[in-house]
Each structure stands twice: as structure tokens, then as C-alpha cells.
Amino acid sequence: MLMIGISMTFEVKASVYQFNFNSIDGKEINLKDFKGKPIFIVNTASLCGFTYQYSDIETLHQKYKKDGLIIIGIPSNDFGNQELSSNQKVKEFCAINFDISFILTEITKIKGEKGHPFFRWVKKEAGFLAFPKWNFYKFLINKEGLLVKWYASTTRPNSNKIK
């Protein structure tokens, strides 16, 4: 009897569930708590030309939260210094101007050695082009915790590309 050895190499994708953030109120957000739900993550800034997208993101949240969609906004000052000076100011700005009800993290570093590991993971999983170059990059995570799509700042949350 002849045994033929077959070997296949494949890459096992890492999931988003390894990451944690701090909420805008200082509470820990464990992404593993959202296993089995799709997650839409957006890096945001309060004083950006794309800030109007907060309204579209909130609309998306209201439309799909009943289906389990989790939306997380990640304020950052890394692109053009366009974020407010404190978490409290960001929280108030979002509440007053956009009536935000989705999850917001604390102001978070994205770029450089001190950048949040989530964004290094995005680059590893989807390549250099997926790494945020500006505010309001968007990342869609499937129910298994895998990054399935990303969108640049110019893609509005209510675009047919995202729905």
C-alpha cells in the first residue's frame, strides 16, 4: 500500500476578540463580549470635515442594533489634531450634536509605537491600505470576529457599499 503525504499550508486568521478598549467613561470594553455579533468600528474626530458622518453612523446603529450590530467609535487626535482635548468634551459634543447612542472609546492613539494594537492587527489582516490614513476609516468585523471589509473616510456609513 502506497501512502502519499499531502501537506497544505494555510493562514489562520486572528480574530478581533483579543482586543480591549476603554470606553469614553473609563470602563473596559472587551471585544470578546461581542462574539457572535457583527461589529462596525470607526476611528473618529470631532473637528474633522468628515464629522458629519457621526449622524450616518448613528442612523446605521438605530437601523441594525435590533439585528445585533455593535458599533464602536474610536476618537483619535492622530490625524490633523482634530479631536477635542478631553474624553468628557468628546462625549458632550457627540451627545449634543449627534445624540450618539453607540459605544465610544476614550481618545485613542492609532499611529506609531503607542498606537492601539487593533490598528496594527488591521494592517496585518488587510494590508497597508486598510490602515487609517485619516479620520473616519471604517472596519466591518463578521460574527466570527474576522475583519471582512474596510472603508476609507470618503465612504459614507449610509453608502450602498456598506449596507
What are the language-model segments listed below?
Residues 1-7:
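Bacterial N-terminal signal peptides
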Residues 10-32, 52, 117:
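N-terminal "domain-start" segment that seeds a small globular fold
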Residues 35-42:
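Local sequence-structure signature of Cys/Sec-based thiol-disulfide redox active-site neighborhoods
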Residues 50-115:
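Structural microenvironment flanking redox-active thiols in thiol-disulfide oxidoreductases
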